[in-house]
Amino acid sequence: MRRFNRVVTQRAGALDDAFLARGRPLGQARVLWEIGPEGVDIRTLRNRLGLDSGYLSRVLAALAADGLVVVRPSETDRRVRTARLTRAGLAERAELDRRNDAVASSILEPLGEAQRARLVEAMAVVERLLTASMIRLQPCDPRHPHARSSLGSYFAELAARFDGGFDIDRANPDDPSDLVPPAGLLLVATLNGEPVGCGALRHHDVRRGAPHWSEIKRLWVVPTVRGAGLGRRLLVALEQRAAAAGARTVRLDTNRVLTEAITMYRAEGYREIPAFNDNPYAHHWFEKRLAPGGPRRGQARVASTRSTNAVSGTAPAQA
């Protein structure tokens, strides 16, 4: 991996003091590009690039001194600072795009047609896997904006895919208190500070402080990151949380149109059982027995290979 990093940084010119011969290092050029034609608020920019506040402030100050960027309070919220490109900044961004395209062409030009196809395909795989490694899973209060955004997108996709649409009020809606400890929890997946998926756990039949079984709910992945294994990662994380709480079994339900989810569940060891609830949108009910502590690391690796071959992405998993 370190050798790969060295080759890429050298070939891309990332170590040059004047990236693409424009008189500024790669860090400044990247920030200029990320601000984009529409501008961006500083917090979003910092989260997107994973930059330290002090470093980003210095980069923006350097770009502003060159007349490329203007930093000012937002017109809609004076507490929020935004960065926008000046006319010179827009021209510089366009020139960086042109020169980046030229570098890409210079990389591909010496290669044969088959080699080019292999390189582009390999780049896509590396990008997808590196993106997957950057996604973070964290418990989230159902009232948090990230939670509301994820669940809202989840419900909207169900409404678009289900025959006859989807009405949350008919689907055994959860009270927010059902998805926070000790009753349950909600996990939200974030990439560069933005929500890209979620999954919930609700404990049932609690005996002596531990649930006899837990229900997995609201499992969803944003379409732009499907195929990166996030659906299975959320599923395993929820199984582990259920086992840690003392549950012996996890159950879930799903709709017949969500074939991707059904394939994943079966690949991950879920077996179909009779209905355990009266959800009007469910056609299949599944159950899985848990080992104490949840899936072991070796088991997770084997299952990961199996599920990657079985399903390319994870749509909304259940109603």
Regions found by a protein language model. Give the residues of each.
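N-terminal leader segment of winged-helix/HTH proteins
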Residues: 1-26, 146-151
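N-terminal helix-turn-helix DNA-binding core of bacterial DNA-binding proteins
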Residues: 14-55, 60, 66-68, 175-184, ...
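Basic, amphipathic "hinge/linker" alpha-helix immediately C-terminal to the N-terminal HTH DNA-binding motif
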Residues: 39, 75-99
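Conserved GNAT acetyl-CoA-binding A-motif
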Residues: 43-44, 213, 235, 241-255
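Conserved acetyl-CoA pyrophosphate-binding loop and the N-cap/start of the following alpha-helix
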Residues: 51, 225, 229-237
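Conserved N-terminal entry element of GNAT/NAT acetyltransferase domains
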Residues: 84-87, 121-145, 149, 292-298, ...
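Acetyl-CoA-dependent GNAT
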Residues: 132, 139-213, 217, 222, ...
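C-terminal "cap" of GNAT-fold acetyltransferases
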Residues: 139-143, 248-268, 274-319
